[in-house]
């Protein structure tokens, strides 16, 4: 992760301008007590009425200048923090895109949403308004103390001592808040995850009448989040009143001490008035200390959470010596492939090859490792043993971009984006795809019939995760998306399970017409794979049977049992 200093360094000129504007505005602020001193000593007590107009004009000009430079300061800080926040969000999102599937298997979506949105917002706030105030408080205090020392250096030791004490208290407060904010950030991510999962699966929740259970689960996390915020509040209310008390008492103490100096002839009345004004300028930084410490502690906790994400390195990366294939024919070979995940053996000694334009069918019981073959081919995971080759080249040597562009896939768990049907179909070939190609892909996937009955047709906006469409309709749009990619390899993972037999037959005819496309079809239905050039049947991560449809039936093994389970009743009748 780039350090915050590197983000700030990119816009150093902006921060220089903002700080210069701030210094100018603060310097102008320091003139008010000086002018007040002149009015008291020279006009009221000295009777020099002729300079009153000049002094009043000075107040107006100082006010105008203060407003202009104050605007420049605040606008620049806001602009720069928004810019840096956007860049941090972009960099974090880009980093997430590089991470391997294993990371997303182990990390909740709600947690990542909290990091990308809430935590970056807190850092952005720290670099903007909070950061501006922190710098302003520091510069303001330096200017005020300089002016106070120039008026009466003995009395200036009082505010210096008070400020040092407040700084120590602020450090103690920050240390107490640090762990609390880390816990709050963590629980916020959990709460977001619970809410996101519940709302995404609201139909399932209602179908199983699980509303009460989900409410209790949410409330338990909500209560913990509430308790953590109460813990935070207890720390704040313990220290906030101290800062406010000191801020109110200091001007009074200065007035008393200054009054004694005036009576002893060591200070003019105007100087005392100016000194009290300067002391009031000391109070708001002290009152702000608690608030600034609170927000900075929150931002630091958020930064630590984001930093942890950047510490995660992608397990799947391009090799140093990438091989670029001039033309991908689509020859796929698994050579003694084995795969373990979290110590569990998923695939064992899998070997097969599919030539260009040929079709491989893969069957097996749930959990037999069928979908893991897709994960290997896409390099979502790397093999534990053996190798996967594309056109004779180990896919670990091919760039991930070229590899994944060469494979179109229809996943078992169909995911459609909250966008138009058109955008969902042309996702795989977005930059060059024309409308007639989209319609052709939809027709090939038997999707055009229901799409064109919709009021907006291809401009129809699909609800979140395809809400509003049936399972079969979602599968057909997903198939159209894969076909529109025109990749040399097409993988279908149980992608016709929600289709009626007639629609499945039409799609099968489309697949058969793709003579130059290598097809790997994973299915539970015999009808989806019976036309394949070769069929492999997996059991417990191993190839138990292989052959053509007719050869496997003749063996009367697992494939035959599946066939009889699906068609036995029909054959008997």
Specify the residue positions occupied by each region the protein language model found.
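Membrane-integrated ABC transporters
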Residues: 1-29, 36, 44-56, 65, ...
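ABC-type nucleotide-binding domain
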Residues: 319, 325-573
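Transmembrane helices of ABC transporter permease
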Residues: 10, 14-27, 57-58, 62-65, ...
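An intracellular "coupling" helix at the cytosolic face of ABC transporter transmembrane type-1 domains
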Residues: 101-102, 118-127, 131, 135, ...
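Hydrophobic alpha-helical transmembrane bundles that constitute the permease/transmembrane domains
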Residues: 19, 23-34, 63-71, 123-126, ...
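Short intracellular "coupling" helices and adjacent cytoplasmic loop segments at the cytosolic face
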Residues: 45-46, 82, 90-114, 118-120, ...
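Hydrophobic/aromatic residues in alpha-helical transmembrane segments
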Residues: 32-36, 73, 77, 92, ...
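Helix-loop-helix
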Residues: 48-50, 54, 147-162, 231-304, ...
């Amino acid at each position: 992760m780039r350090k915050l200093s590197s983000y700030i360094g990119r816009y150093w000129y902006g921060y220089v301008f903002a700080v210069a504007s701030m210094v100018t505005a603060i310097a102008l602020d320091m003139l008010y007590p000086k002018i007040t001193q002149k009015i008291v000593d020279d006009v009221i007590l000295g009777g020099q009425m002729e300079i009153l107009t000049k002094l009043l004009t000075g107040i107006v000009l100082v006010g105008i200048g203060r407003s202009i430079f104050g605007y420049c300061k605040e606008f620049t800080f806001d602009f720069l923090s928004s810019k840096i926040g956007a860049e941090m969000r972009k960099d974090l999102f880009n980093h997430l895109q590089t991470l391997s599937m294993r990371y997303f298997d182990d990390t909740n979506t709600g947690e990542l949403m909290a990091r990308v949105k809430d935590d970056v917002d807190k850092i952005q706030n720290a670099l903007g308004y909070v950061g501006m105030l922190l710098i302003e408080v520091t510069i303001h205090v330096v200017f005020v103390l300089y002016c106070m020392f120039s008026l009466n250096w003995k009395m200036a030791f009082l505010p210096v001592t008070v400020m040092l004490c407040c700084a120590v208290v602020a450090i103690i407060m920050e240390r107490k808040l640090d762990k609390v904010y880390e816990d709050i950030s963590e629980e916020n991510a959990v709460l977001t995850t619970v809410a996101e999962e519940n709302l995404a699966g609201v139909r399932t929740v209602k179908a199983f009448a699980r509303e009460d259970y989900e409410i209790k689960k949410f409330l338990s996390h909500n209560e913990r989040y509430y308790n953590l915020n109460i813990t935070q509040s207890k720390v704040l209310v313990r220290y906030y009143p101290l800062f406010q008390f000191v801020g109110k008492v200091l001007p009074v103490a200065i007035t008393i001490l200054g009054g004694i100096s005036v009576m002893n002839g060591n200070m003019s009345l105007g100087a005392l008035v100016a000194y009290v004004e300067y002391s009031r300028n000391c109070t708001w930084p002290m009152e702000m200390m608690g608030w600034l410490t609170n927000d900075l502690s929150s931002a630091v906790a958020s930064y630590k959470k984001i930093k942890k994400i950047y510490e995660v390195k992608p397990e799947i990366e391009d090799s140093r010596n990438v091989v670029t294939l001039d033309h991908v024919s689509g020859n796929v070979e698994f050579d003694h492939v084995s795969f373990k995940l979290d110590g569990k053996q998923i695939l064992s000694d899998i070997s097969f090859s599919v030539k260009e334009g040929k079709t491989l069918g893969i069957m097996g019981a749930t959990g037999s490792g069928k979908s893991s073959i897709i994960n290997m081919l896409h390099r979502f995971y790397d093999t534990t043993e053996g190798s996967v080759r594309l056109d004779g080249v180990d896919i670990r040597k091919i760039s991930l971009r070229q590899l994944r562009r060469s494979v179109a896939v229809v996943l078992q768990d169909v995911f459609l984006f909250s966008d138009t049907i058109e955008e969902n179909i042309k996702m795989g070939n977005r930059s060059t795809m024309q409308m007639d190609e989209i319609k052709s892909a939809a027709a090939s996937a038997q999707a055009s019939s229901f799409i064109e009955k919709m009021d907006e047709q291809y401009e129809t906006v699909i609800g979140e995760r395809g809400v509003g469409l049936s399972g079969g309709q979602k599968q057909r749009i997903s198939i159209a998306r894969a076909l529109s990619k025109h990749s040399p390899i097409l993988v279908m993972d149980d992608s016709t399970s929600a289709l009626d037999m007639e629609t499945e037959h039409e799609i099968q005819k489309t697949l058969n017409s793709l003579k130059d496309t290598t097809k790997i079809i994973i299915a539970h239905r015999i009808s989806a794979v019976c036309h394949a050039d070769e069929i492999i049947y997996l059991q417990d991560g191993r190839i138990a049977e292989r052959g053509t449809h007719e050869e496997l039936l003749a063996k009367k093994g697992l494939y035959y049992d599946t066939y009889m389970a699906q068609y036995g009743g029909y054959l008997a009748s």
